[in-house]
A protein has these predicted regions:
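Gly/Pro/Ser/Thr-rich low-complexity, intrinsically disordered segments predominantly at protein N-termini
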Residues: 1-215
């Protein structure tokens, strides 16, 4: 059987926000690979550390997406903290929980950030981030041209999937009658939504087998 790598990440105590406004370049120089913060029109917003449920769901979904993309040779999956600089005129440097870039657009990935809109962004919401993820970020990602935006709420056991239409606006794409969502940005990828709520979460290996990715 092909080797499947397990996703791991370390969570650090957030740094204090600097005083005053700064440019995006100054923000990059101020932060480091352990910085959990976003740049919003010159202001630095320090993010709250994730709770256990948020972390577990994020790692499971990131692992599933990453392994699928690797086995199918589709592109690259990144996890927070990794910055996304949204295109002008949006003055935003966001840190989504998960992002995916297809091979055709992998040149957007710089050493410490993604310079433009990824193909897919996933936000795993928390009570603190819910309004921001459903409000500000929804509008920003739509305007930036992020082709798919997934909102996963572990507390409510609710997953929402949005796809950019020809009119450049998001439309909701529900799971089918079997509770399965099929992505367009990752050809062949499908997600059984109930996987996200299982306790404990299923093995990525087991899910990949059910998807027919590995034997």
């Amino acid at each position: 059987m092909d080797e499947v790598r397990e996703a791991t990440v370390q969570y650090e105590i957030p740094r204090a926000a600097p005083a005053g406004r700064m440019s995006f370049e100054e923000f990059l120089a101020w932060g480091d690979e352990d910085t959990w913060a976003e740049w919003v029109d010159g202001d630095v917003v320090v993010l709250t550390p994730a709770n256990l449920k948020h972390q577990d769901v994020s790692l499971f979904l990131a692992g599933l997406l990453s392994e699928f993309a690797v086995f199918r040779k589709l592109g690259k999956v990144m996890i927070a903290p990794f910055l996304v600089r949204l295109p002008e005129p949006l003055r935003r440097g966001r840190e989504p929980d998960i992002l995916y870039i297809s091979n055709e657009r992998v040149s957007l990935l710089k050493e410490t950030y993604c310079d433009g809109a990824p193909d897919l962004i996933v936000e795993v919401t928390s009570p603190e981030s819910l309004a921001r993820d459903r409000g500000e970020k929804y509008v920003e990602y739509e305007a930036a041209g992020v082709r798919e935006y997934w909102l996963v709420d572990p507390d409510r056991r609710q997953a929402e999937f949005y796809r950019l239409g020809e009119n450049r606006r998001y439309r909701s794409v529900p799971a089918d009658e079997r509770g399965v969502f099929k992505s367009e940005v990752l050809p062949g990828f499908w997600l059984k939504v109930d996987w996200l709520w299982e306790e404990p979460l299923p093995s990525v290996v087991v899910c990949l087998k059910e998807m027919g990715v590995i034997q």
